[in-house]
Amino acid sequence: MRCSKTTRISILSATWLLTTAAASMAEDSLLKAAEGSSLKAAEGSLLQAAEGSLLQAAEGSSLKATEGSLPKAAEGSSSLVLKGVWLNENNYTLSRYQRVGGKGIHGGVDVRLGAPVRARGQPASNDWSLALLNLGLPANAARFTLDTRDALALDLSYREITQQLNNSGLSPFQGVEQLVLSDNWIAGSHSDSFDQGLINQPLNRALVRRKLQLEVSQRINAVWQMTSQIELEKQTGHRLNGMAIYTNAANPHGVLLPKPVDQQTHHFALSSLYNDGTTAASLGYHFTGFNNHFRALTWQNPFLSGLGTALDYPAGVGSYVSAPDYSTHQWLASAGHQLTNRIRLTLDGSVASTRQDENLIPLEEIDGRQADIDQPVDRLDGALRINTLRLAVLTQPLRRLAVNFRYGFKQRKNSFQRYAWPSIWGARNDTSDTDLRINNRPLDLEQDTYRLDANWRLKNRTRIQLRYDYLRTARNFAAVSLTREDRYALTVYLPGSVRLKHRLSLTMNDLAGSTYEWSRGFFQDFSTDLINQTPANQRWTNHPLLRQYSLSNQEKSGIQWLTTYQPDSAWTLQLKGETDWVNFDKSELGLTDVRDAHFNFSASYRHSSRLNSWGWVDYRASQRRQTGRDFLGGINKPANVSLPPYPQGSDPSRNYQTDQDNTATVVGAGLDWQFNQRLAVSSSYSWLHGREIFDIQANGARDLNGENLPNIETQLHSLDSQLRFKSSERLSLTLQHQYLRFADNNWQWQNVSLDAMRQVLGSGQRNPNDVIHQLTFSLQYRF
């Protein structure tokens, strides 16, 4: 089982730091660097779009409210809040980031304490505050601050948040890190042959994140200050992962599994700051340690895949290796000096080193016995080093004109050695061990960035901002080794009046790459023996056209418009529009065109000092066009081998095109009414409608039929109403009602049973169809 058995663990563990953990921790990964600015344009895969980012956008404030900066109790104020919450049903919409819990009645407490204030309004010499929020509820948090005003400042905080995704699916597997099937499991070649009564284990998809943070700042004198920060973060729970089962791409099968999550991240930072008004400097040290308590997931193959007794049920065991432990040390320094009244110079740099902190997982045979194959090393002793340098010259040659020059350098240096790692792709004697060895690729990168920008204020209230960036990126072990990008930006603040303001922004990016060496990956990954056995016209790991230019050649243009109008003291109107277009001008296959648009209109009206109302309309549209090419003949007729009348990879009649159009419309309105000094009400309503269209078209071949995928419709109604009553100066009551009506018809889950896809063991997850009522009663006492 390729990529799904224990024999692959050590290979994945050995290369993980090179491709994932260290890259994402120590700076942008090579893939991100190669993609350049196309990352934003191409980020939405079809699967991600089909899963629906609309829900995430609709509930956005839920996460923001929970994860946002913790409130600090006002100086001299203290309060106690008692909460009672009733929820009518369990759901995955309101509870995606749990703030309350499941169905039923829940209780919570908020406590806020603050330093006393002197009679004349002067605070005490030591200011402190304590906030304990949502005690007894899933999304609880706490914060303590202390400020001596003379020297010491301390900020200690803790927060906990639970993410509960749709867990209505079922699984036949038992266990946590070693998933096994029941003793009476009857395997089959397809999922519809399984006994559905044995698929009865809940599929847990909850994830809990806890974060503890301490920040201390000590002022030594008028110009020197020391700051330190410690942060501990722990994540536990499960994520849903799809795992593949196959050997040499033959007879593939798949399963959906709950992947355990149990990891800790430690951050420590120490810095020294100097600032005398003319010269500023700082020295700093950062440390990050990642500790993963879950190393590998194994599971029984539930299928009879025809891959041999060693790979099929019950002996076949698949495996997945998680991120290894690693540590990062970073040293930083910066300095700035005011050379003259019109010129300031700044310089900063950093050096970072990331190392893997654990030995590799032993390589094992597919039948579970210890493999008689030696690994080149038991531990990766190299390091990934990231060096940065930035220089800025800030000038103001004229009273209304500022001109700045900036230069940045980034170096990603990988000191890991290259090794040939043994790999067993299938049953014995499929190919010799020497032939199937895979080389790791220590990725290096160097990037130079130049920026020139100007800010010009004219006498007629017009302000013009111009910016030009040039990026040059060189990398090894990549099909495109060199990219150059020019970025232009123009922003104009148009003349208007005190009540009417306009802003126009234009951007254009041009990314160009060197020649796409499509065979480079084949020669760098595989052994010389395998290369010599492979015909010269078949030495490639990817189709020559599929990703040839899509990530390294593109033209992007964008426009933004903002108008704010206040016809009088009561009205405020705002109109905003923006659109982006990315043209992958040299792509024949793959992603070829991306268009995004966003328009927003909002209005607010202040009827009186006690009554405010507002409304808004928001529209978003995204269009992505991808082109694919179908191949005949399978493994014996590679796409780049000439077969009459065309080479398969060059026959345009076998093209097919996928157009993905996503739209989301939101309409909302709200009211805030203070009846009198004691009674106030507020209410807001929003309606969201989203549609995702997948249009598939064939290009002429008789045996290719373009059949569109079903549209995905998403609807959300949200109503939030509050009644606030102030009984006295110290006592107040709040009654809140939240109503949510959410439903979608996502075809990827709707009516997709456990055995709907014959070669994939699914989960039978249900689509959300929620009607949610939540009542919250709060009693606040100030003292």
Language model features by range: what are they?
Residues 19-21:
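N-terminal signal peptide c-region/cleavage motif recognized by signal peptidases
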Residues 13, 23-24:
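Cleavable N-terminal signal peptides
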